[in-house]
Amino acid sequence: MKKYNKSIGFYGEDLSVSFLEKEGYSILEKNFNCSSGEIDIIAIKDEIISFIEVKSRFSNSFGNPKESVTCSKQRRIINAAKYYLHIKKLYNYYIRFDVIEINFHIDSSKYELNFLKDAFRV
């Protein structure tokens, strides 16, 4: 099941990247990892760097995908974002923390993508 969930996650991230590029974002990083945490997608548009968490699900039985971005997960993303900005020397940008929710339909290849800008703040 874990392997299956990972492949759903990677597929959701690929769909998210395609969506963001169509919306005019440039992708800076995908799956950025450091000791502080991981960021699924880092993108930029209009001088705003977006740190994006992607949550993909087949069911809302465990709540909406965004609800799984807990306070501790938010802290890890924020710390990883600070580290990323520091090592890349990106000091003169606005930043934003977004969530992309993807709800897959079990009986078809359809899905719903919901882009939640400014989903949480520092």
From Swiss-Prot:
InterPro entries reported in the protein's UniProt record: Restrct_endonuc-II-like, tRNA_endonuc-like_dom_sf, UPF0102_YraN-like
A GO MF term: nucleic acid binding
Pfam families, A to Z: UPF0102
Family in the record: Belongs to the UPF0102 family.
Protein name per UniProt: UPF0102 protein CPE1705
Coiled coil: none
